[in-house]
Amino acid sequence: MLQQIYDFLNINYNVSRETFNKFKEYYSLLSKWNSTINLVSATTLQNFWQRHIFDSIQLLNYIHNKDIIVADLGSGAGFPGVVLSISGIKNVILIESDSRKAAFLLQAAQLSDQKIEIINDRIQNLKVKCDLVTVRALANLSTILSHTKQFTVKDKYLILKGKNYQHEITQALLHNKFNYTLYQSCTDDSSWILEIRI
């Protein structure tokens, strides 16, 4: 089973054996912490590779340069921010308001050879300069755009969304101007990757 997972990641995302071993360490660390603080639901932890690793790493399909600054909002258990960092994104900022989750992220960040900064604060309190914003399971699109109005985002947002994506886009367009592209998630037929440029 693990060999098949490695082969998939290696063929599709050029994941080395060393990087794959870091993902396995990530699973062990997450399992340990999840017993004391609720980072992910127990059912999704059982499906760690598809639900969390594949779901996060697929964003690399829409990132064409790893030498960038990525701001990951509401990082929680580190998806997708930590996964992208372990996969070679040079500079990742993890933003998490919950101090317990930020403590977990501090440990998870040690698995990466790249630069990771952890900011334990609310998104709306920050002025962040980055190339790309990533978001997974945080808030509706209108809230995300409102909370990041003071950000300087050079390129785009990549937001993992579920089946209500169209309603969220319609509502957000009432108060915001942006262009968007939708991509089907490779992990779930009812999930989408929303690419936004403002």
UniProtKB/Swiss-Prot annotation:
Where on this chain does S-adenosyl-L-methionine bind?
A: 74, 79, 123-124, 136
Location in the cell reads: Cytoplasm
Q: Which reaction does it catalyse?
A: guanosine(527) in 16S rRNA + S-adenosyl-L-methionine = N(7)-methylguanosine(527) in 16S rRNA + S-adenosyl-L-homocysteine
Enzyme Commission identifier(s): 2.1.1.170
Keywords, comma-separated and alphabetical: Cytoplasm, Methyltransferase, rRNA processing, S-adenosyl-L-methionine, Transferase
InterPro entries per UniProt: rRNA_ssu_MeTfrase_G, SAM-dependent_MTases_sf
Q: Identify one Gene Ontology CC term for this UniProt entry.
A: cytosol
Give the source species.
Orientia tsutsugamushi (strain Boryong)
Q: What class of enzyme is it?
A: transferase
The task this protein performs is described as: Specifically methylates the N7 position of guanine in position 527 of 16S rRNA.
Top-rank taxon, per record: Bacteria
Query: What name goes with this protein?
Result: Ribosomal RNA small subunit methyltransferase G
Q: Which family does it belong to?
A: Belongs to the methyltransferase superfamily. RNA methyltransferase RsmG family.
GO function terms (MF aspect) = rRNA (guanine-N7-)-methyltransferase activity
